[in-house]
Amino acid sequence: MEKKIYKHEYFGELYYLVNVPEEYKNKKGAPMLVFLHGSGERGKDFNLIAKHGIPKYINEGMKIPAITVCPQCPENFIWNNYVFLLKDFIEYAAKEYGADTEKISLTGISMGGFGTWEMAM
């Protein structure tokens, strides 16, 4: 997974990992999967993002037929506090990587599950 930093005008930097499968590079209309990690992976450390869940599986060789983006929640915060940042980030990632905005899925574990629920509300 590639290491990237998204810069937001109000929230500052958001570290994230991205995986674009070969079949979706330089093409538009791909599905996109957004993975939110748990509370133990907050901060500004790419290795923490890849510790559990989908980024770990991709690094171990799992093929996911979608663009996968995995943002990192800033330290001392929870995803529930960052719904507006997540919304902006997802819009940015969809445009940046050519995802179909009708084919975006959001998932998470632990604190990331709560963030997923909050985004759905």
Positions of the model-derived regions?
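A domain-start/cap signature at the N-terminus of enzymes
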Residues: 1-32, 66, 107-114
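Gly/Ser-rich "nucleophile elbow"/oxyanion-hole loop immediately N-terminal to the catalytic nucleophile
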Residues: 23-28, 74-110
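Short glycine-enriched nucleophile-adjacent loop
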Residues: 113-121
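Structural motif
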Residues: 25, 60-61, 96, 121
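Short amphipathic alpha-helical surface micro-motifs
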Residues: 1, 49-54, 88, 111
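Active-site phosphate/pyrophosphate- and oxyanion-stabilizing loops and adjacent acidic/basic residues
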Residues: 56, 91, 117
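A generic structural signal for short, solvent-exposed coil/turn residues
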Residues: 8-10, 18, 60-62, 91, ...
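Active-site machinery of serine-nucleophile hydrolases
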Residues: 32, 36-85
